From Swiss-Prot:
Pfam assignment, any one: UPF0149
Protein name: UPF0149 protein PD_0802
HAMAP family reported in the protein's UniProt record: UPF0149
GO cellular component terms, semicolon-separated: cytosol
InterPro entries assigned to the protein according to its UniProt record, in alphabetical order: YgfB-like, YgfB-like_sf
Similarity remark: Belongs to the UPF0149 family.
Amino acid sequence: MESPMHLPEVIAVEQESQQMGLSVTAPELHGSLSGLLAGGGCNGPDWLAMILADAGVAAPPKGSVLERLYQATASQLEDPDFAFQLLLADDGATLAARAHALFEWCRAFLGGFGLAAHCRSVLSAEGDEILRDLAKLAQASVDDFDMNEEKEDGSLEEIEEFVRVAVLLLHGDCLIGPCAPQRLN
């Protein structure tokens, strides 16, 4: 049996999304969901309708791939061991496909985070800076980079790790508020 914190495979998310008639990729769906949850938004079955801005979209059925995606993402964000992972491209995807999925994920994350905008005013200075950095990534395109597999693979992995940690920091800001420097006098 799969761990409740294990994200479903990209292909399974894509297939179920298509079966439901959704025109969204797995990275977009996970990015939007992650943004919504990181910002303290919807905590229930209406998450899909909320991120798609379509009240007519039914909640994913219990035990479905999309319901497992929601449960795993929520669990990962709350994990004290920082288990949060990005759902991007399948293993073996080209560097360009992986980069495109990351930029797509970032665009969707910002949209989902914006839906939970009530927490925006409580972000730390680092949180504000991270949002600006994520916005730059969201505007990026694979055409902006030299897609030399050997040279750029490590760089893309570093950017993915930055995004992963950025999401956790933003979630922390929204969950407990920014940490203000303490004065000792």
